[in-house]
Amino acid sequence: MNSSFSAPAKKSLGQHFLADRYYIDRIVQAVDPRPGQHLVEIGPGQGAITFPLLRKHGALTVIEFDRDLIAPLTDAAAPIGQLQIIHRDVLAVDFTAVADGTPIRLVGNLPYNISSPILFHALDHASAVADMHFMLQKEVVDRMAAGPGSKVYGRLSVMLQAYCEVTALFVVPPGAFRPPPKVDSAVVRLVPRDAASVLIKDRKRFADVVRAGFGQRRKTLRNALSTVCEPAHFEAAGVRPDARAEQLEVADFIRLANVELA
């Protein structure tokens, strides 16, 4: 039984609504909600994932920016379960406050045009998040999960993997959406690392080092990081200054950012 409703996709909001039952079921299976967990869906859209999750779990919080979807979501959810709707831009939502002491499980088919800002916003609240299951452009998921030496290994890879375990799950073709996007999508799982295992001393400095390193990725680290690192930083961290950012492991960036010179 599918309770999703029809609503026109808004290009300005980057909306592509999932419509294929097979992939909807695969996402719900990947999330595998359990009693007592607090599920939060970002951008429920027409309810393709919302209502199967609600039917399976009984309660769900959703964050929806499009006011035209609020009433249809409310009406369709009424006979199924308890749906709490937060009508707000997701980037303005305080996930820590939403969690209220119980780590939340984030789910969502993220709008292509703001997927990276949403990911970094979620990272800011990692201590309040149990895990995340997101559908994004496959190109973005490839970058998120990439390792050193890959052409798509970059700032997004390092920043996410420093704070989360990142696992690409499966690809979703354009035909599974209405309207179909021009590219493949993919589902990814992110599990925030325990705070004690994230050995980053200064989050801002770490972000600055990673940004500078990949901002000029064809240059050696000596040149790319000239504004944020001195030669002694490389020596203390055991990182070769003639290497390039794409050759460094996540742990290398962490050591480099953590160095404190006397």
Curated annotation (Swiss-Prot):
Molecular functions (GO terms): 16S rRNA (adenine(1518)-N(6)/adenine(1519)-N(6))-dimethyltransferase activity; RNA binding
Signal peptide: none
Family matches, as Pfam families: RrnaAD
Chief location category: cytoplasm
One of the record's GO cellular component terms: cytosol
EC number assigned by the record: 2.1.1.182
Cell location: Cytoplasm
Top-level EC class: transferase
InterPro entries with a match to the protein in the record: KsgA/Erm, rRNA_Ade_diMease-like_C, rRNA_Ade_Mease_Trfase_CS, rRNA_Ade_methylase_Trfase_N, rRNA_adenine_dimethylase, SAM-dependent_MTases_sf
Swiss-Prot/TrEMBL catalytic activity: adenosine(1518)/adenosine(1519) in 16S rRNA + 4 S-adenosyl-L-methionine = N(6)-dimethyladenosine(1518)/N(6)-dimethyladenosine(1519) in 16S rRNA + 4 S-adenosyl-L-homocysteine + 4 H(+)
UniProt KW keywords: Cytoplasm, Methyltransferase, RNA-binding, rRNA processing, S-adenosyl-L-methionine, Transferase
Source organism superkingdom: Bacteria
Binding site for S-adenosyl-L-methionine: H16, L18, G43, E64, D89, N109
Family to which the UniProt record says this protein belongs: Belongs to the class I-like SAM-binding methyltransferase superfamily. rRNA adenine N(6)-methyltransferase family. RsmA subfamily.
Role, per record: Specifically dimethylates two adjacent adenosines (A1518 and A1519) in the loop of a conserved hairpin near the 3'-end of 16S rRNA in the 30S particle. May play a critical role in biogenesis of 30S subunits.
Protein name as it appears in the record: Ribosomal RNA small subunit methyltransferase A
